[in-house]
Amino acid sequence: SIIWGVGGALALFFVANMVVEQFPDDWKKRLLPFIFVGPAIAILAWYLLIPVLRTFYASLFDAKGEVFVGLENYIYAFTSKAMLESFRNNLLWLIVGTGLSVGFGLLIATLADRADPVFETVVKALIFMPMAISMVGASVIWKFVYEFRPPGAEQIGLLNAIVTGLGGKPQAWLLVQPWNTLFLIAIVVWLQTGYAMVIISAALKGVPAELLEAGRIDGANELQVFFKIVVPYIRGTLVTVSTTVILFTLKIFDVVQSMTGGNFGTQVIANEQYTQMFRAFNYGRGSAIAVVLLIAVIPVMYYNLRQFSRQTEAF
């Protein structure tokens, strides 16, 4: 499929270019942008715009898509107990997940940048390694970490093995509210810290040594140099990394579905959408929740693209 796709695109552009070459120069300049950008816009419209419009249309109808109900599904999306719980949990994911991922990424990148090059490479490889694991795969790994067995039984879960080894009682970590949501967030922090570390590390290496030395000569200690020179200098990168992780946490689904199925107070927006559409078979409500999630993601995505564009222009 890759060969056919790439080959087809090359053939399309080659033939289109041959056709455009037959026109006068003035027409060439007008037609070339449409020739090269047009197919991409058409594909995006077919696979993105049309499904969005169909989803919005479906959100205005009842569960079976037969009776027009107007904004009733949206009222449910903003007032039902399940959705209010989902909004609360998504906000927790957004604040804690993003804060810890970027914070740990910045900390590790800063410490590794000061270490021996060989040690730096090894540490970065180990921290980045979880990024190669799928969300479901990571969930399976962490299920063994949080595994619970009744008191007296052999604890195969790492966390409970440590707790019982220290004389404590085993806990059903994924059932304890509201801490279970934080235990799920820990999985994404484990996954996203590597991404944040790599991007921030590249930005740190771009900080001019002369700037750091000037700060030290002026009497600034290392903490002052870091917070008053380094952090402001890489602010754009920190914002870009943060918004990228925010997008990820807003759409979080795999971890929650794999670990708890949204039960025990861990429901999130994307999982509630899945529940309504594929368990309750209420396509109207599911579509409305999908639209709400899309509206929540668009401003962050737009801001992220603006930041990326500014950084590109700076170079």
Annotated model-derived regions:
Residues 1-26:
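Transmembrane alpha-helices
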Residues 23-27, 228-231:
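Short, Lys/Arg-rich N-terminal segment immediately upstream of the first membrane anchor
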Residues 32-315:
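A structural signal for multi-pass alpha-helical bundles of membrane permease subunits
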